[in-house]
């Protein structure tokens, strides 16, 4: 029986997942269009606080948090209050879960 090393298949499987994740990420133009379409831009900007926090500040606060994507996606969908002050963020039930996840993933890539 011929034995083959297992590491190449593990490496290429991992590379496939990374490539798919990179493919799913929004580019800046698509993300900004989604911000406008979904109404996020009424309260948020990339680099300055409007009513809600700047997206760069959100990315900095949650940097390194492995649960940030899931937790923030949930807050965007259901709304929240108290994390960035007492002005509530309304729920965004009209935005699809996939769009929310893509937008939050993009936000988490931003740097100051």
Predicted regions and their residues:
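N-terminal export/targeting leaders of redox proteins
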Residues: 1-29, 111-112
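Sequence/structural segment immediately N-terminal to covalent heme-attachment motifs in c-type
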Residues: 26-46
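Axial heme c-ligation environment in periplasmic c-type cytochrome domains
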Residues: 42, 48-62, 75-104
């Amino acid at each position: 029986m011929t034995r083959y090393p297992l590491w190449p298949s593990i490496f290429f499987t991992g590379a496939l997942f990374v490539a798919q994740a990179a493919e799913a990420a929004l580019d800046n133009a698509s993300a900004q269009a989604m911000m406008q379409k979904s109404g996020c831009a009424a309260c948020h900007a990339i680099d300055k606080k409007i009513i809600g926090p700047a997206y760069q500040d959100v990315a900095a606060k949650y940097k390194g948090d492995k649960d940030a994507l899931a937790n923030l996606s949930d807050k965007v969908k259901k709304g929240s209050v108290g994390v960035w002050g007492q002005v509530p963020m309304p729920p965004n039930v009209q935005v699809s879960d996939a769009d929310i996840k893509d937008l939050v993933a993009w936000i988490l890539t931003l740097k100051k």
